[in-house]
Amino acid sequence: MKHTELRAAVLDALEKHDTGATFFDGRPAVFDEADFPAVAVYLTGAEYTGEELDSDTWQAELHIEVFLPAQVPDSELDAWMESRIYPVMSDIPALSDLITSMVASGYDYRRDDDAGLWSSADLTYVITYEM
């Protein structure tokens, strides 16, 4: 399925840079403290666009989420994202072969409200692709 290829292209590009992170194909349900720093690449909201007749065009939100221990400030999440993730996202040749467009759509902070184990920064893009 194309979704696997999309995630793999981003993960491969990120893994080529020495980030020191544990990478996840999909958003993990649980973390071990040894996993930090962690980066998850996943898709949400994938749906058929129906824009063109006889076309199988889809759109989804691509997430690149950085996870660090809960006690780190947002500024540390920002520094991690700005120095290790954002520069890679601007040049992924394997991804450009799979998509028709990619537009930055958001940046959000999250906290583990259940166990208090992690904090995260989630960089999102809206991507369009042919299935």
UniProtKB/Swiss-Prot annotation:
<keyword id="KW-0426">Late protein</keyword>
<dbReference type="InterPro" id="IPR009312">
    <property type="entry name" value="Phage_lambda_GpU-like"/>
</dbReference>
<comment type="similarity">
    <text>Belongs to the lambda-like tail terminator protein family.</text>
</comment>
<dbReference type="InterPro" id="IPR038512">
    <property type="entry name" value="GpU-like_sf"/>
</dbReference>
<keyword id="KW-1171">Viral genome ejection through host cell envelope</keyword>
<keyword id="KW-1162">Viral penetration into host cytoplasm</keyword>
<dbReference type="GO" id="GO:0099001">
    <property type="term" value="P:symbiont genome ejection through host cell envelope, long flexible tail mechanism"/>
</dbReference>
<keyword id="KW-1035">Host cytoplasm</keyword>
<comment type="subunit">
    <text>Homohexamer. May bind to major tail protein V, and /or tape measure protein.</text>
</comment>
<dbReference type="GO" id="GO:0030430">
    <property type="term" value="C:host cell cytoplasm"/>
</dbReference>
<keyword id="KW-1245">Viral tail assembly</keyword>
<keyword id="KW-1243">Viral long flexible tail ejection system</keyword>
<dbReference type="GO" id="GO:0098015">
    <property type="term" value="C:virus tail"/>
</dbReference>
<keyword id="KW-0946">Virion</keyword>
<keyword id="KW-1160">Virus entry into host cell</keyword>
<dbReference type="InterPro" id="IPR035934">
    <property type="entry name" value="Phage_tail_protein-like_sf"/>
</dbReference>
<comment type="function">
    <text>Plays an essential role in tail assembly by capping the rapidly polymerizing tail once it has reached its requisite length and serving as the interaction surface for the completion protein.</text>
</comment>
<protein>
    <recommendedName>
        <fullName>Tail tube terminator protein</fullName>
    </recommendedName>
</protein>
<dbReference type="Pfam" id="PF06141">
    <property type="entry name" value="Phage_tail_U"/>
</dbReference>
<keyword id="KW-1188">Viral release from host cell</keyword>
<keyword id="KW-1227">Viral tail protein</keyword>
<dbReference type="GO" id="GO:0098003">
    <property type="term" value="P:viral tail assembly"/>
</dbReference>
